[in-house]
Amino acid sequence: MTSLVSLENVSVSFGQRRVLSDVSLELSPGKILTLLGPNGAGKSTLVRVVLGLVAPDEGVIKHNGQLRIGYVPQKLYLDTTLPLTVNRFLRLRPGTQKTDILPALKRVQAGHLIDAPMQKLSGGETQRVLLARALLNRPQLLVLDEPTQGVDVNGQVALYDLIDQLRRELDCAVLMVSHDLHLVMAKTDEVLCLNHHICCSGAPEVVSMHPEFISMFGPRGAEQLGIYRHHHNHRHDLQGRIVLRRGNGHS
């Protein structure tokens, strides 16, 4: 399968500080890659590299032609005194046609919000509106920066279900950044754990049949949520230096 974006041994420094070191990844059509890591691990910098906003100091980044990207930011800051409906907010995007707005909202099950004030939306509703905005670009790559932040578990399940539906309909690649180091979208194809470098990678554990998991999240939640078990052979000290572990290194 031809990748839409590939990074090969990419490193980025800001001044004397190395933020990313020797990072490689591939984003392919129809595949979901989830990026995990603690605060300050370089996740946002890596996203900016993928988006073409930061050039690597070392390594190679390859894009597949004129790549169409849809981006959902981590947070949306709006002036609470500014009267702005969902309709008007989406029309602020350059090139957006009025006739495109309602179909995009309906695609994310948010058509009923078209005349709602942006400031009155819940966390989950805001994420759906931002996702609709990203879809206006007919993306080949969908980048979601911590889309479940501020969303409860039921909202996460619904959002993951929607993301899975969209990636199948659009056959787009999905890069999802998560603040949760263990609970991820079950249908993620690959998980990367980043702490300035790739600490480990793998697929989420299938837990949908575990009775304890089902009792906690319900059958639908168990289908959409997965556990990622890290397998580091090292840890990072307070200065960020790598310290090798003894034994099997599972965490």
UniProtKB/Swiss-Prot annotation:
The keyword Transport applies. It comes from the Bacteria. InterPro entries: AAA+_ATPase, ABC_transporter-like_ATP-bd, Metal_Ion_Import_ABC, P-loop_NTPase. ATP binds at residues 37-44. Pfam families: ABC_tran. Its EC number is 7.2.2.20. It catalyses: Zn(2+)(out) + ATP(in) + H2O(in) = Zn(2+)(in) + ADP(in) + phosphate(in) + H(+)(in). One of its GO terms (molecular function) is ATP hydrolysis activity. One of its GO terms (cellular component) is ATP-binding cassette (ABC) transporter complex. Keywords: ATP-binding, Cell inner membrane, Cell membrane, Ion transport, Membrane, Nucleotide-binding, Translocase, Transport, Zinc, Zinc transport. It is found in: Cell inner membrane. It is a peripheral membrane protein. SUPFAM superfamilies: P-loop containing nucleoside triphosphate hydrolases. Induction: Transcriptionally repressed by zur (zinc uptake regulator), in response to high extracellular zinc concentrations. Part of the ABC transporter complex ZnuABC involved in zinc import. Responsible for energy coupling to the transport system. Seems to be important for the virulence. PANTHER family: METAL TRANSPORT SYSTEM ATP-BINDING PROTEIN TM_0124-RELATED, ZINC IMPORT ATP-BINDING PROTEIN ZNUC. Belongs to the ABC transporter superfamily. Zinc importer (TC 3.A.1.15.5) family. This is Zinc import ATP-binding protein ZnuC. It comes from Salmonella typhimurium (strain LT2 / SGSC1412 / ATCC 700720). The gene is znuC.
